[in-house]
Amino acid sequence: LLQSMEGYSKQYGWQDLLLPWSYSAGVFDGEFYSAPKTYETMIMLYNKTLFEENGWSIPTNLTEYESLAKAIQSKGMHVFSYGSTGWQPTHEHIGGMYLNSYAGPDNVYKALIGEKKWSDPEFVGAVELLRKHMVDDGYWSGSLENYYALGWDDFHAQFANRGAAMMTIGTWTFQTTENVFKDISDDWDWAPFPNLTAEGGDPSYLLALGTTLSINGKSDNPDAAAKVMDFVFKNKAIVLDMANDFNFGEFVVPLKFTESDFGDNVNPKVKRYLLTFAEETGKGNYGYTTWTFWPSDPGVHIWKDMEVLWAGEITSQEFMEDHEKLWKKARKNNATLPVGKR
């Protein structure tokens, strides 16, 4: 069991130091128990050199997105590089992106807190669009079979070798992506995944916690543990230095970073991500990842049974009706996770 850190938070002023959403994610029954050590989000990497050569632009709505996909495929390349070998829950990465980008973060929030059903049309539509793009159109690595067959090293190599023009992945990829591009002439960059409605709109940055810091309920010296955490939260330079060692794939504490906090040794692409993420999520422009905000059973269902849907054994409507049943059970058993008020 964990010890409440509510008293330490008030003593040291942690709520003022952390990004609002990240602090709220650690509050249970009104008490602060869990401090974020690493945050992450889903992004869209793209081969910048390839885009410039072909005059392609980052899509901002569904029409532009599907038009770009056709243009990429007409060049004999895959739209995205990605795969699930070695980590079956990879499916939830893409599933969460579509739920937020198609149904919208406001609707996802309402479903998380029980004000909407997961079987509502906007969620069924999101899952069906993903099924179409994955199974029918082969956006990811050319086909569903290829997607299932590729692992971490495979899809990074495919992206770097122009086998695919883009890659949907989390920000934990920064270090690996930088490494696979360092010896080639092409350059890469990142963009938020587009809003998949017809009219487009501002894309959302999905909130996710990779690792957290807490105090063991049986700790013999909780005061010392709290002092260590306070030292981390109040020393941006040290946090950035440690995170930079991992090219910001780990130890990315969600502090309120500003331009002046970064040294010249930080990758400009990563720096832009950290500043943009802090600014946009601070304004409330954020969505939700399944591995941070979904309870256990629905969280497994969203990726495990996705394969049943993709195999054509059930419809998107049936898939989301089953998902809603698991959420009802989780609420009945008080097994849901805290979601900060939007």
What are these regions (language model features)?
Residues 69, 113-147:
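Glycine-centered hinge/linker elements that transmit conformational signals in sensory
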Residues 1-42, 57, 66, 72, ...:
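Hinge/lid segment of periplasmic solute-binding proteins
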Residues 12-50, 78-84, 200-206, 285-292:
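A structural signal for short loop-to-beta-strand junctions that line the ligand-binding cleft
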